[in-house]
């Protein structure tokens, strides 16, 4: 979804986007629907792990999205950039361009978030990120208890300082899931140089 949007933005390239699954599903549109998608073959590949001794020979579900937007259309919508130290470690191991400082501009460009500091958060990106609306005395009591145990309160865990406790940020806006299909494909679908073909399970491309 993201790549198709970016490649067709200039009008210089033509893109055919093939999706094995359907264009969308009713339950992908509303946040509460994610629990219905965990084992729904119409929108989920329903992969499972192989039995192992460590799991008492159980098969563990590995949900993967089978519709436009992929797994962003069925996941729990919690938005986490990743631990800054992990990116820095990758750079130290020789992966140039992967430090947190290097990837921060990309994170900022992709998101639209009203909170946090301007130097670390994006305001005009396609992906809508919001603070969770599910607040109340219980959540605050848990956070206060963590603080009493020495865990710092982290108002914006996507700022680069993730150690601590705080409320989650979500890819939800105005009561709707913000999947990559909604944020990247919907704005691009009317461009003359993109063709989106759903229900197209593909084994090989003959060029």
Language model: regions and residue ranges:
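N-terminal redox-cofactor-binding region of secreted/periplasmic oxidoreductases
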Residues: 1-207
């Amino acid at each position: 979804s993201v790549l198709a949007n970016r490649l067709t933005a200039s009008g210089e390239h033509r893109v055919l986007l093939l999706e094995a699954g359907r264009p969308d599903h009713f339950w992908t549109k509303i946040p509460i629907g994610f629990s219905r998608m965990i084992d729904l073959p119409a929108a989920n590949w329903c992969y499972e792990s192989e039995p192992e001794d460590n799991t008492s020979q159980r098969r563990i579900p590995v949900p993967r999205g089978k519709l436009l937007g992929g797994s962003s259309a069925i996941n729990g919508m919690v938005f986490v950039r990743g631990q800054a130290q992990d990116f820095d470690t990758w750079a130290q191991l020789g992966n140039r361009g992967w430090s947190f400082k290097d990837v921060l501009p990309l994170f900022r460009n992709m998101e639209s978030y009203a909170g946090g500091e301007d130097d670390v958060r994006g305001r005009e990106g396609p992906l809508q990120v919001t603070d969770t609306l599910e607040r109340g005395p219980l959540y605050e009591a848990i956070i206060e208890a963590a603080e009493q145990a020495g865990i710092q309160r982290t108002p914006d865990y996507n700022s680069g300082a993730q150690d601590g406790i705080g409320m989650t940020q979500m890819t939800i806006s105005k009561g709707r899931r913000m999947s990559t299909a909604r944020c990247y494909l919907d704005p691009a679908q009317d461009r003359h140089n993109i063709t989106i073909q759903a229900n197209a399970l593909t084994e090989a491309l003959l060029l």
